[in-house]
Amino acid sequence: MAIRIYSVDQQASGQFDEGNITEQKPIGFPGEGSAVERVGTLFYWAWFQTKREGSLPLHPHRGFEILSYLLEGTVQHQDTLGNEQSIGAGGLQIMQTGTGVQHAEKYGKDTSGFQIWFEPFMGEAYYATPTYADYEDEDFPVEIRNQAKIKTILGTDSPIRIVADAQMWDLTLPAGQSFEQVIPEGYSIAGLVVEGESTWKSGIDTHQVSVNEFVVCEAEQTQNLHIQSKEQTDSRIILIQVPSVLPYPSYKEIKIRIQSKS
């Protein structure tokens, strides 16, 4: 298994609302300078943080499946479908943007979370009816495995169903404790360390990973990934499993096809 570590300097960054909303982007948009441009169906990943209350005005999306997951604070969502909802820490908002939707966001002070885009097959997604849903922390299943706390965001028993092939977990490891995950052949796990330090191991390949670092583990054959928190600190890691390669034509290819027919 190939395990690749990306420092903050190898990730993209951004800001909004006159610098109030800052973003660390493990996977930025094309041209933003992140070392990783996509991992299979995982198209974009930004970790946003606010210093004070802030907002983003109404803006459009089409086709992509976009989720916002909060670590701390609050986010209020408003869209052209008529939705106006708020979530708190541990909550999630998901848009399947289909034929197109516009939305605006308001952020509370000291809010931290992720916006993550998954790419379904746009030959179908561009013509689907857009949808919105939101969930609170208690809506998600939690498993305790060898003292590791595993909250399933996408996957078995999660209330969320998306079209793109993806699973997602919020993993908390007490100091010195470990977690093991089987990665199927042809799949990758992308991980972002939001707290603590940990050791990532597959076979003889071992890496030390610190807070803010981004990890991509690509399984050419079915293999185990072992993650252990350092003895001195707890760790919190967001993990996303997706196909290593997008299994259908990309959104760019679909756009070219659509434009050629118009």
Explain the meaning of each model-derived region.
Residues 1-262:
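Jelly-roll (double-stranded beta-helix
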